[in-house]
Amino acid sequence: MNPKKFPMPTGMLLKTDDEEKFLPFQNPTTYKDITVELKPNGEALRVYVTAGTTPVQRVTLYFADPLPEKAQVLGGVWERGYGDYEWRGYVPHRVMPWYFFLQSGNKTEAFGVHTQPAAMCWWTAESTGYSVYLDVRCGGLGVRLNGRTLCAAELCRAEYEDADGFTAMGEFFSVLSPNPILPKSPVYGANNWYHAYGHATEDDVLREAKALAELTEGLANRPWFIIDDCWQIDRADNYNGGPWRAGNKGFPDMPGLAKKLRESGIQPGIWVR
């Protein structure tokens, strides 16, 4: 791996609750009571946002840093892949959450954001350059910093020679997440979505959990049973938005069900969205 430094952005789009303003970027750049400043941290680049009373929603930094014209691009996803995780050509409006990779010849380039940022971050890219979007909203409204400084994100970049994409991705993810938060023991067990598809009751859960307990008898690390979409009070085939305050008639006592699972040696889990 060869860490690479970012050049300075050439432009910045600042979005508040009331307006959007494009500004040529000079480090730092100030507009009204908002200042955006970039500071190196080793090979990485930290993005700091300071503001008074103006609610800040998003900071977009544009880098006029040419990329290989015929590269294949793979970007991140917000939650998980839905059959759309792929290497493909440039699509300038394609949203790539957290990171993206470029493959050109025997070289793989990587761009990303360190884990645990203070913003929701995504990238766009084309052969003439790339942008990173830092959404710092608090809920749906701009954050009110009231004189404070927010380290919104730390940007990272690296280059890999003679490395296939999978290897480069694995190495770069270790850079983005140097201190991963891992469970004490492997997480395994059952989830009732991919056979019940939302049509299950407490009796079904207890029957399947009993089979799971028998299959894992004697193991100190006990399995989980995840009660997926099926339990919530307003469960329907065309809607899964809650509320999440109680079970439906098939699940009359959710705390009691969790207790029964624990007593059978199963760790209870629950699905919400």
For each of these PLM feature ranges, what is it?
Residues 17-18, 37-43, 124-131, 135-137, ...:
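Short, ordered beta-strand-loop transition motifs
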Residues 47-49, 146-148, 225, 261:
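Short low-polarity hydrophobic stretches
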